[in-house]
Amino acid sequence: MKEENSQAHYLALCRELEDHDYSYYVLHRPRISDYEYDMKLRKLLEIERSHPEWKVLWSPSTRLGDRPSGTFSVVSHKEPMLSIANSYSKEELSEFFSRVEKSLGTSPRYTVELKIDGIAVAIRYEDRVLVQALSRGNGKQGEDITSNIRTIRSLPLRLPEDAPEFIEVRGEVFFSYSTFQIINEKQQQLEKTIFANPRNAAGGTLKLLSPQEVAKRKLEISIYNLIAPGDNDSHYENLQRCLEWGFPVSGKPRLCSTPEEVISVLKTIETERASLPMEIDGAVIKVDSLASQRVLGATGKHYRWALAYKYAPEEAETLLEDILVQVGRTGVLTPVAKLTPVLLSGSLVSRASLYNEDEIHRKDIRIGDTVCVAKGGEVIPKVVRVCREKRPEGSEVWNMPEFCPVCHSHVVREEDRVSVRCVNPECVAGAIEKIRFFVGRGALNIDHLGVKVITKLFELGLVHTCADLFQLTTEDLMQIPGIRERSARNILESIEQAKHVDLDRFLVALGIPLIGIGVATVLAGHFETLDRVISATFEELLSLEGIGEKVAHAIAEYFSDSTHLNEIKKMQDLGVCISPYHKSGSTCFGKAFVITGTLEGMSRLDAETAIRNCGGKVGSSVSKQTDYVVMGNNPGSKLEKARKLGVSILDQEAFTNLIHLE
């Protein structure tokens, strides 16, 4: 056997490519050209095809991705992967330091690290070889994503001899800004949905069943924790050991002796934030001593020895290219800013809300302006201000069009309201938006019916009203390009499931002006059946808590229209069953909740629905009548007001316990 085809040569080639991967992806100092690397990798693959029995678990070829798997198995974590509590002010930082020092009886050292906005994973090595990788999941169990994690070039598949035989590392999987932009450009070329931000892109990529597709996207990872045998007592030193063993650790963790030093480092990281190649939303502070960490322990959800300090939302300048006008389900015209795409708080922003014509005039926003864009609560893009010094000559004041941009009917400005409305009952845009709302998550929650499918159903003349959805057939749906029999059956199955709906959800789905889930719950709780809601008088409606004259008038007017009543009857004739409302005996019944910030693993809508299912009420502002304020990430001014009024504040763990979500 030739030397170059021996098993010894194969192993040497594996080690050589392993070294080149480390130089290129971790040190960012390539030692050979891409062509030379590809030739060596091609030789490795040839040897493995000829001698499959020689292939080792840590072969660089495993980074290319295995065959697609059918699904991900669920595996229990060796140790729970808990969350880290968030803080947003120096006062909360001070409280954390005081709490730690009081519990330990001394002032400990702290490690400060970047809080990368990615996807947490746990990676296990046996005999110094990567054998398993799990997603965080619910903290107790995660999905086995080993094949996808192997594709990360900066992650070692095998550890050096001075590393322990058995270890687990935990890290954050992410995309750099540059890679994220490339991925979205490819998504656009393929006419697929673009990702809102790098975190969503990373999460979606790890969910792909084809590791070969994952490998093409070039995920990255940063290690933030090591679980290993031995007597080392320093988290900071553990991170240094990880670096020595070839793991990527982003941002040079800092070891601090005092709280004052921690605060200084936090300021430094904030100034460096804009120059980082990846998205961070804060920094993580950890008690450095592992023994002290064990003493401090954890709550059911958070570690008591760590805190995430969140920075203020970012702002970005960009060009306002145009002001588009959208028509909503009730005919209201809404102006939307079309922006030159800009990366903001990890999201690629190309649209921003302008609310209404009065708001545009108040801020003097014009087409061609350079504007400053921010995210309200780091979620909804909005135009904060105009950079008037950059305004081009000849710019004009913008006014709402006099005609609907879709049906070209005259629009009207309603008395005492800022809204401009298309009142043409035949306007296709309003009808499509009404159906889109009807099937949406806050209403009947019918899967697989997006705006493109609904629009195509309209164009084909298959749907004109919400009731028409319940008489669609497989043959109807298969007329839409791209929908085959299996997809059609999935849509029909979702529609069939939606035929059994609670009264409050059905009232929301109807799209009655001014009626959201809060008012719908009040109506359902008082009248209990749809027939009684329909027959309610204006005076009866007005007597209910939280319903004023305008809302009562909107409800009465809606149900006095025979067109609406006929559509409801048609739905019932087609099998829609509206369940009567039954009051809950929950301890939350009648309690008033206000939510501030973003909840982890739970949308605002899910949280509000859970509260209402327990008989609670959801408010939009804090007052003396508020019983609980639920605090998520990035809470707003509602939190401070709750503290001043002495309202009970629930973190997410207390909230889920109260409403029995877990």
UniProtKB/Swiss-Prot annotation:
E.C. no: 6.5.1.2
Q: Which cofactor does the UniProt annotation name? A: Mg(2+); Mn(2+)
Q: Where is the BRCT domain?
A: 583-662
Q: Where does Zn(2+) bind?
A: 404, 407, 422, 427
Q: Which reaction does it catalyse?
A: NAD(+) + (deoxyribonucleotide)n-3'-hydroxyl + 5'-phospho-(deoxyribonucleotide)m = (deoxyribonucleotide)n+m + AMP + beta-nicotinamide D-nucleotide
- What does the entry give for GO biological process? DNA repair; DNA replication
Domain of life (superkingdom): Bacteria
Residues recorded as binding NAD(+), renumbered to this chain, are 34-38, 83-84, 113, 136, 172, 286, 310
Name of the top EC class for this enzyme: ligase
* Molecular function GO labels: DNA binding; DNA ligase (NAD+) activity; metal ion binding
Instruction: Write one Pfam family the protein is assigned to.
Output: HHH_2
Q: What Gene3D superfamilies does the record point to?
A: 5' to 3' exonuclease, C-terminal subdomain, 6.20.10.30, BRCT domain, DNA ligase/mRNA capping enzyme, Helix hairpin bin, Nucleic acid-binding proteins
Q: Where does the record place the catalytic residues?
A: 115
Give the matching InterPro entries.
BRCT_dom (IPR001357), BRCT_dom_sf (IPR036420), DisA/LigA_HHH (IPR041663), DNA_ligase (IPR001679), DNA_ligase_AS (IPR018239), DNA_ligase_CS (IPR033136), DNAligase_adenylation (IPR013839), DNAligase_N (IPR013840)
Alphabetical UniProt keywords: DNA damage, DNA repair, DNA replication, Ligase, Magnesium, Manganese, Metal-binding, NAD, Zinc
Question: GO cellular-component terms in the record?
Answer: cytosol
What PROSITE patterns does the annotation carry?
BRCT, DNA_LIGASE_N1, DNA_LIGASE_N2
**Function according to Swiss-Prot or TrEMBL:** DNA ligase that catalyzes the formation of phosphodiester linkages between 5'-phosphoryl and 3'-hydroxyl groups in double-stranded DNA using NAD as a coenzyme and as the energy source for the reaction. It is essential for DNA replication and repair of damaged DNA.
Family, per entry = Belongs to the NAD-dependent DNA ligase family. LigA subfamily.
NCBIfam families the UniProt entry points to? dnlj, PRK07956.1
HAMAP family (alphabetical): DNA_ligase_A
What this protein is called in its record is DNA ligase
Q: Which organism is it from?
A: Chlamydia pneumoniae
